[in-house]
Amino acid sequence: MIVAFTRVRRKAAAADERGSLPAGPPAAVLAVALLAALTAAVAWGSTSIPPGEVWSVVWRRLSGEAPRPGTDDLIVWQLRFPRALLAALVGAGLGLVGTAVQALVRNPLADPYLLGISNGASLGAVAAIVLGLGAGGALGLGLSGAAFVGALATFALVWAVARRGGGFAPLRLVLAGVAIGQFLSGFTSYLVLQAGDEQQTHSVLFWLMGSLSGATWELLAVPAVAVPTALLWLQARARGLNALLMGDETAAGLGIDVTRLRRELFTVTSVLTGVLVAVSGAIAFVALMVPHVCRLVVGGDHRRLLPLSALFGALLLVVVDIVCRTAMDTQELPVGVVTSLLGAPALLYLLDRRLGSVS
């Protein structure tokens, strides 16, 4: 028995180190790139603002100095900076959720939308728009609140179905999430058809395709707490995530309560997904693609993978949002459309490269 346990330990250590690269250099590069992207996101637009003035406005606001007269302060502090920060937070959160869900169900092609949570959030948001539930405009706090309630209700339903018969098996969890998610998606489509006017329909479709245009400092509050908290929680359980990828027996041999860890992972990823979808709508491919890219750089060890996924996800969504705002003069592109157009070819390339290296 002792020999078997020692072999399990060695197997886990080897899996932790396989294909790994120290996370420090890539993380430093991503951090610098993220800072540059945030600067560009605030500086670029219909009215260009010099980068030096951008950070001058931010510094004056943070230090409590009186803002200078003019439009630059309004554009930077009230419009573009909250949006850039929201893009970074949502991108980081999607990167974390994607990494965690892929470990939860032991499937590298899984993402949080597989569990049905985003479908529930979308139904809540569409109901708020079409049926007039909740206070606030189409991109106000009423919409976000309704989306989060929908996500939590779906979480409870998927949890109840997945727990039937005892245990918390990945296959049962995925099947429950897919089935419930498809049902909610059909109901959402029905509500879209019931939209009373063209403006309502446009608001619904634009939100369903992902949008950061409703960013405000008030809207930032919840994701600003939820994303760092989730990162710290997941980082503390990184070895458990590594063990889950090697199978339940191996994880149990390492002293991990597999069922409890899966329950906790499902809860955390569901709540975080609900928060993200509530403030940004459904943004595709980020949670699926980011972990794949980061694994190519630092390997599969979640101690390195989680922080790098958060940084890369933040950078990716900030850059995508710049494209969405500036690509067309007459209107803004939905964020989810751009992530799908960029993400699908990139993911196919990465998968082809990985499968080619295996063969």
Give the label of every model feature segment:
Residues 1-359:
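Alpha-helical transmembrane segments in inner-membrane proteins
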